Every structure is written in structure tokens, then in C-alpha cells.
A protein has these predicted regions:
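C-terminal "cap" of GNAT-fold acetyltransferases
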Residues: 117-132, 136-165
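Acetyl-CoA-dependent GNAT
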Residues: 2, 6-12, 17-87, 91-93, ...
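Flexible, glycine- and charge-enriched loops at secondary-structure boundaries
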Residues: 42, 97, 154
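Conserved glycine-rich acetyl-CoA-binding loop
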Residues: 68, 91-105, 118, 126-133, ...
Length: 165
């Protein structure tokens, strides 16, 4: 059985435990161990996850396969007609099983529920991440690129991709 459920503050440890596996797996060949550690704390400490959900309006959804958490997606309203797909990750053992696509589709569904009119979903993705082709297959287009400082002398070297909804 497969389901996607909206996360609450009670689910922070689930998100963090998934991130502890998927984030290093995704970026181990792209980022230094030091930058990985910095970014894990910056994005996934309990304090920062709580801030994202309460103060910044992130909506997290967790995918479950046979009752076990296997991935998550986070979207955030960003302006009047734009939403940012902040995070979408699936456990390595479940990649290739269409869970990422289903999480992506869930993000679009939620955005349409919040904003029934035309809008855009954007995301940042590391230029060296194989996920670029995943997003392109789902209809996203590169709209910009940049090197964005995130603190401690680190940068995110990203494409910004967009999809009209």
C-alpha cells in the first residue's frame, strides 16, 4: 500500500531520519563532507524544520510504502502567484519506483488547491545533480542559474527551474 500524508510538527523526526539517508546519498559526490554537515543542520535541525513549518509556511508531505516512510516533499508559497518546491527526496532503495513522480504530482495538487488560478512552481536544483533530468521529464524548464551563498562560505550552484500550473 502507498500513501502520501501531510506532515505535522510531530513528524519532524521522520523527516530528519529520511534526510539523514537521502541528503548525503544525493550530494556525496557533489559537496564536501563539511558542506553536507552544514547544510544538514541548516535545513534539517529540529529548530530549522519547525521554523520552516511555522514561520515560513512550508507544507511537508511524507510518502509511505507499506506503512514505512520512504520520501518527502516540501512546498512553500512565494509571492502571489509562485510556489517553491523546496525539497523532494526519496530513499535510495525506492528510487525508480515512481515515488518521486507521485510526490511531485502531490505538490502540484496541493498548489492547485491553494491557488486555483494560473501560477508557477519553481525549484532550485544543483547543476550537477542527476535530478535535473527528472524535473525536465516532468515538464520543468530551466529559467535561470546562479551561485547562491548559504553561509559559512558555502554556495548552492543551482539551476532555477519553473513549471506553469
Amino acid at each position: 500500500m502507498f500513501e502520501i500524508r501531510k506532515a505535522t510538527l510531530d513528524d519532524l523526526s521522520i523527516i530528519r531520519s529520511l534526510a539523514d539517508i537521502v541528503f548525503p546519498h544525493t550530494y556525496r559526490e557533489i559537496l564536501s563532507p563539511e558542506q553536507l554537515d552544514y547544510m544538514m543542520d541548516w535545513m534539517y535541525s529540529d529548530e530549522n524544520l519547525r521554523r520552516q513549518m511555522i514561520a515560513e509556511g512550508h507544507l511537508y508531505y511524507i510518502a509511505y510504502k507499506e506503512g514505512e516512510p520512504v520520501g518527502y516533499v516540501s512546498i512553500q508559497p512565494e509571492g502571489e502567484h509562485t510556489f517553491h518546491l523546496q525539497k523532494i527526496y526519496v530513499l535510495p532503495s525506492c528510487q525508480g519506483c515512481h515515488i518521486g513522480k507521485r510526490l511531485f504530482e502531490k505538490a502540484i495538487q496541493v498548489i492547485k488547491e491553494i491557488h486555483p488560478g494560473p501560477c508557477q512552481m519553481r525549484l532550485n536544483v544543483n547543476r550537477n545533480n542527476k535530478a535535473v533530468t527528472f524535473y525536465e521529464r516532468l515538464g520543468m524548464k530551466k529559467v535561470a542559474q546562479g551561485d547562491f551563498p548559504i553561509g559559512n562560505g558555502y554556495y548552492m550552484n543551482d539551476y532555477i527551474m519553473g513549471l506553469d500550473i
